From Swiss-Prot:
This is Segregation and condensation protein B. Belongs to the ScpB family. Homodimer. Homodimerization may be required to stabilize the binding of ScpA to the Smc head domains. Component of a cohesin-like complex composed of ScpA, ScpB and the Smc homodimer, in which ScpA and ScpB bind to the head domain of Smc. The presence of the three proteins is required for the association of the complex with DNA. Gene3D superfamilies: Winged helix-like DNA-binding domain superfamily/Winged helix DNA-binding domain.
Length: 291
């Protein structure tokens, strides 16, 4: 701290035995401003002196008395040095370098960002924040969702798809993003695959036999195709002769169609598989269609 005082004294040429060169009023104002900024750096949050404490004798900017001004500056620096030297140095170091812990929301945001298109469940987030109960994590997420949706300075939102929370781009930025992203994709599912997937979604848990009955044709290879693509999963066996496998749609299904649960599916009479044949890049899991 003594070194800092010496530097400031040297900077302002404030040695008592040094002859002060007269300054103009404007130069005087600029010197006083520089001094004020330098003194501010010496103040601490623990015991912050006021200008009444350290510079009660500093003259107004309009003064033309150079000797009086520099005498006031010397007095202020000496008094500041005494105040700072009296402070607990360990406390000064702690206040200067101690890092504050990130909030739960900040950690959740970072986790969802890293998870990307896979998203994270409450259980997975709880492993990252084990000291926070899942009920509290749910509350934090709900507050984040509300905050993101209400903030017009945010181009992102958070959605829950099949129990997995994901960071997505808002619907409002779709047109702006399309100016820079020209990539379009062809839905990898043809009409037959879409029909089988719809049957599973609306009738889950569903067996292969049930799928064949509804479509009226053999759909075994189509079921295998959907299993391979990860859009349906085995969830057990039916209590019927032969104990056939039961199938549900997967988390990837919710991600692909941008819905949070089966309840969000359109009514059967309104469902048109052809409407899903083509889509824009931002209609996928990185884009929220529900705004």
């Amino acid at each position: 701290m003594k070194t800092k005082i010496k530097k400031i004294t040297k900077k302002f040429n404030l040695k008592k035995d040094t002859e002060v060169k007269p300054l103009s009023t404007q130069e005087l104002i600029e010197e006083q401003k520089e001094f004020s900024q330098a003194v501010d750096k010496l103040m601490t949050k623990k015991q912050k002196p006021t200008f009444e404490d350290i510079g009660s004798s500093i003259v107004d900017f309009e003064t033309s008395d150079n000797d009086k001004f520099y005498e006031s500056v010397r007095d202020a620096i000496e008094k500041t040095s005494e105040i700072v030297d009296d402070l607990d140095q360990s406390e000064l170091t702690k206040n200067s370098y101690e890092q504050k812990e990130l909030s739960a929301k900040a950690i959740i945001q970072a986790a969802l960002y890293v998870a990307g298109r896979n998203g994270m469940t409450l259980q997975e987030l709880n492993k990252i924040l084990p000291k926070i109960h899942q009920d509290q994590l749910f509350k934090e997420l709900e507050e984040m969702i509300y905050s993101y949706d209400q903030n017009l300075n945010f181009g992102l939102t958070i959605k829950n798809y099949g129990g997995r929370y994901k960071i997505l781009t808002k619907a409002a930025v779709k047109k702006d993003m399309q100016r820079y992203v020209s990539e379009r994709f062809k839905n990898p599912l043809n009409k037959s695959l879409m029909e089988v997937l719809a049957i599973v979604a609306y009738n889950q848990p569903c067996t292969r036999v049930r799928i064949n009955e509804i479509r009226g044709v053999d759909s075994l290879s189509l079921v295998d195709n959907l299993l391979e693509k990860g859009l349906i999963v085995e969830v057990g066996r039916a209590d019927t002769p032969g104990r056939p496998f039961l199938y549900n749609v997967s988390e990837k299904f919710f991600d692909l169609f941008g819905i949070e649960s089966i309840d969000d599916l359109p009514q059967i009479k309104h469902f048109d598989p052809d409407s899903y044949q083509e889509g824009d890049f931002f209609d996928s899991n990185r884009y929220d269609e529900n705004e």
